[in-house]
UniProtKB/Swiss-Prot annotation:
UniProt biased composition (Basic and acidic residues): 172-285, 301-311, 327-337
InterPro entries: CIR_N_dom (IPR019339), CWC25 (IPR022209), CWC25_splicing_factor (IPR051376)
Coiled coil feature spans: 19-65, 326-389
Gene of this entry: CWC25
Subcellular location: Nucleus
Bias-annotated ranges (Polar residues): 312-325, 347-363
Role: Involved in pre-mRNA splicing.
Keyword field contains Nucleus: yes
This protein's UniProt keywords: Coiled coil, mRNA processing, mRNA splicing, Nucleus, Spliceosome
Name used for this protein in its record: Pre-mRNA-splicing factor CWC25
Region named Disordered: 40-61, 163-380
Phylogenetic placement of the source organism: Eukaryota, Fungi, Dikarya, Basidiomycota, Ustilaginomycotina
Subunit and interaction comment: Associated with the spliceosome.
Provenance organism: Mycosarcoma maydis
Family the entry assigns: Belongs to the CWC25 family.
């Protein structure tokens, strides 16, 4: 029989696993309970601090807090529908509960009717809504802000000062505005000029049609006269050509004289005189075309009409251009010149940056090559010094010989031919 500790057989022994598990569970429960108590104590402290802060706020003049749990401690006489005697009679069985319930229902009905009347009285009508909108403080503030903004827009000096304070470049903006106004004025002038030119072309077309009809009649009459009129055609043609040249010279001198006068006068009347000059040129061209068509009466009528139209169109195309188109061309040339200069500057900057990069890269490569040459020279010098001193034999000498052969210090012609035998080819 083997001996042992009989206490381990007892159910109360602390070394038993069951007892240890029981102790562990109790300790765990105690720890959880302690945590809960600590959390509850912390919540109580927070509530106490909140109440103290609310009390200080009420003492400072803030909104008073309403306690919602006072009804729990109120007496039945103050909260119930009836008096304390009625409640006691109900408890003793002397009164029925129906009367109490009916009284409460009547009170509730009266309260609901009063609420409905109040809600009907407070209904939002159109007049009430208008009054509310009119008396809205936010709307009044917005209206004042809008009025102040409009007043600021009407005051350009104040607006410019605010822009300068905000850091906005007013000069560039004013330049843009001036450029836009100039462009708008030029477009408006071009539209007016085009409209006037269209009306003038309509009048000239009507006049040319009347001239063409008259020329047709003249050509028909001259065509029907017969051979008697054809004898004088050569003289008539020479006279008409002479008149044509005289008219051209006279019109050219008149146009140059008017242009000279227009340059000396105000710019505002320049467009009117240009229009009068153009009308004069148109009239002279139409007169020249009619005289030329009369001189060429021996050709068919349809051909003369086509020549007349061609001459009138050529005279219309040879009209002088106005000053606005010249200004436009000058502005376009200036813009193109500026763009070309900017492009050239950018190209020069790119070329300089590329040259700098190339020079830095070349200097870096040169430095690396110089460093490599220096290392090779040091190694070669070390080998030469070791050989001159006679250090090492056998394997060391063999390695140094191979290194010298690698660096071409002691390689004769036979060794080089032996190495290059694979690359040599026989030439027949």
């Amino acid at each position: 029989m083997g001996g042992g500790d009989l206490n381990t057989k007892k159910s109360w022994h602390p070394l038993l696993q069951v007892n240890q598990e029981r102790v562990w569970k109790r300790e765990k429960e105690a720890l959880e309970e302690r945590k809960k108590l600590e959390e509850l104590r912390r919540e109580r402290e927070q509530e106490r601090e909140m109440q103290q802060l609310q009390r200080l706020q009420e003492e400072a003049g803030g909104k008073k807090r309403i306690d919602r749990v006072d009804w729990m401690y109120a007496t039945p006489a103050t909260t119930g529908s009836g008096s304390a005697a009625e409640m006691e009679d109900y408890l003793l069985g002397k009164k029925r509960v129906d009367k109490l319930l009916q009284g409460e229902e009547n009170k509730e009905m009266s309260k609901t009717t009063q609420k409905s009347l109040v809600s009907l009285q407070n209904a939002n009508s159109a007049r009430d809504l208008a009054a509310k909108i009119r008396e809205d403080p936010m709307l009044a503030i917005k209206q004042q802000e809008q009025a102040a903004y409009e007043a600021l827009l009407r005051d350009p000096t104040r607006l410019r000062q605010l822009k300068m304070q905000a850091g906005i470049d007013t000069d560039t903006q004013s330049k843009d505005e001036r450029r836009r106004s100039k462009e708008e004025k030029r477009r408006r002038h071009d539209r007016d000029e085009h409209r006037r030119r269209g009306s003038r072309h309509g009048e000239s077309r009507s006049e040319s049609r009347s001239h063409s009809r008259r020329d047709d009649r003249d050509r028909k009459s001259s065509w029907n006269e017969g051979s008697s009129s054809r004898r004088h055609d050569g003289d008539e043609e020479r006279r008409s050509l002479k008149r044509h040249r005289d008219d051209q010279d006279r019109d050219r001198h008149r146009y140059e004289r008017r242009l000279h006068d227009a340059d000396d006068s105000r710019p505002a009347s320049r467009s009117n005189r240009d229009r009068r000059d153009k009308d004069a040129v148109d009239e002279s061209s139409s007169r020249q075309s009619t005289s030329y068509s009369r001189s060429r009466s021996r050709s068919p009528p349809a051909r003369d009409y086509r020549n007349d139209k061609r001459l009138s169109s050529s005279s219309a195309f040879t009209r002088p251009s106005n000053g606005g188109s010249a200004r436009n061309r000058e502005e376009d040339e200036e813009r193109k010149q500026q763009a070309r200069q900017l492009k050239l500057q950018e190209m020069e900057q790119n070329a300089r940056s590329m040259e700098q990069q190339r020079s830095s890269y070349v200097s870096k490569i040169n430095a690396e090559e110089a460093e490599q040459e220096r290392r090779e020279a040091e190694l070669r010098q070390k080998l030469i010094d070791a050989r001159s001193k006679g250090h090492g034999d056998g394997k060391g000498n063999f390695i140094m010989d191979q290194q010298r052969k690698t660096f071409h210090d002691s390689v004769d012609l036979a060794e080089r031919m032996r190495r290059d035998r694979a690359r040599l080819q026989r030439v027949d």
